[in-house]
A protein has these predicted regions:
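AAA+ P-loop NTPase catalytic core and its hallmark functional loops
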Residues: 2-201
Length: 201
């Protein structure tokens, strides 16, 4: 089958040359679970040079906002980007995740219909019926995978979700673990777990 040209590639593919150049030219300490130092993340977002490679700016705005965002993520805390529609919140979220983890695909899109299952875990019901609760039947959400791997997950439009879903997310992030009673186990968050959420004002 013929491979079709995609409309939009993820940031880590689109800017792979720049990301590789920054990693190759790295001179500063890289935090656990990160692909590059906070200083290199800032260079990737705001522009500069890495060796002979020109790093294009991804965000044209207040440098301090990006510095605070990177500092927050260094402490394994979650980050909420709030602003008017069209002010590059999702764009910044994707590029921060691409620079820090090299994978911006762990995304939950918030809507009025988003359920707790979409932030915790759900089940493959065919497998669940066939063999009962099992690891094979467990369907891991992007946030669950981020907890397992100690990575960053992204939650777009969190303010569109019902309050009970937001409460469940806050509980999950404060406890840093997900209980799976059907399997009689818990999934604890690996070091470096963070969540970047966006919300419109």
């Amino acid at each position: 089958m013929e491979q079709k040209e995609v409309q939009r590639r993820p940031a880590e593919e689109l800017f792979r040359e720049e990301l590789d150049a920054l990693k190759a030219a790295e001179q500063y300490e890289v935090p656990a679970g990160w692909n590059m130092s906070p200083r290199s993340v800032l260079t990737y977002i705001l522009g500069g040079k890495a060796g002979d490679v020109e790093i294009t700016p991804k965000y044209i705005g207040d440098r301090r906002i990006v510095e605070i965002a990177v500092a927050t993520l260094m402490t394994d805390r979650s980050l909420l980007l709030i602003g008017e529609p069209g002010t590059a919140k999702s764009w910044l979220s994707e590029h921060l995740t691409a620079a820090i983890n090299g994978d911006s695909s762990r995304v939950v899109q918030g809507t009025a219909g988003t359920t707790e299952e979409q932030i915790r875990y759900s089940w493959n019901y065919a497998l669940l019926i066939a063999e009962g609760p099992s690891e094979r039947a467990l369907v891991k959400t992007p946030i669950f995978r981020a907890m397992e791997e100690g990575k960053i997950a992204r939650f777009e439009e969190i303010s569109r979700c019902a309050p009970e879903v937001q409460d469940a997310l806050i509980s999950l992030l404060s406890e840093k673990r997900v209980s799976i009673p059907e399997l009689n186990r818990e999934q604890a968050a690996a070091r470096a777990l963070s969540l970047i959420s966006t919300a419109n004002t």
